[in-house]
Regions:
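Composition-driven recognition of glycine/serine/threonine/acidic- and proline-rich low-complexity segments
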Residues: 1-178
Length: 178
């Protein structure tokens, strides 16, 4: 498990602003557009599908309420004084779809490769007792996270090896990118 760096801080540091727009949410998941603004135009930097772990650990409940109310996951957990780490499940490339291109204000061309990462986010009070909080599948704008050489295409990976929440998250993200 690697120490989790907060995506919202990375976006703000690199692009000068950070906002989150929850596009869709229910009790088990949410789709969020993490974006920066430029001359009044929103540019998606990360499109994220979150599949929340059930049940939520008591140590995370207050922060979870704020997250479910539309706040940034990493920022909220950090502001609550919680520690985070992420366990990367897979990394790949996938083609940019029409919807992702539109969210990126057409700064990413349709069919160009984008970086995709799926990880399990753990959070808690003590480093040795972090609890699973969610599985998160992210697609990144190339200016935020470039496609690494040697990454395999998502369609070339063996999805039969993934657990059901990972499969669900990847499928939901692919639909949102289309």
């Amino acid at each position: 498990m690697e120490q989790h760096r907060v995506n919202s801080e990375e976006i703000k540091a690199r692009f000068g602003s950070y906002h989150v727009d929850v596009l869709k949410q229910d009790q088990t998941s949410r789709l969020a557009n993490l974006y920066s603004t430029h001359d009044g135009v929103a540019v998606c930097r990360t499109l994220a599908i979150t599949r929340f772990s059930q049940p939520i650990s008591p140590a995370l409940r207050e922060a979870d309420k704020r997250i479910r109310a539309g706040h940034s996951i990493g920022n909220t957990l950090q502001q609550a004084g919680l520690l985070m780490s992420r366990e990367v499940i897979m990394e790949a490339t996938t083609p940019c779809g029409q919807q992702f291109s539109a969210l990126c204000a057409q700064t990413v061309l349709v069919d160009s490769p984008v970086y995709l990462r799926v990880y399990r986010l753990h959070a808690g009070i003590e480093p040795e007792s972090l609890n699973p909080y969610a599985i998160i599948a992210e697609a990144h704008h190339p200016a935020h996270t470039a496609v690494h050489a040697g990454l395999r295409a998502l369609n070339d990976l063996d999805a039969s090896e993934w657990e059901s929440d990972t499969k669900w998250s990847v499928d939901a993200l692919q639909k949102a990118l289309a």
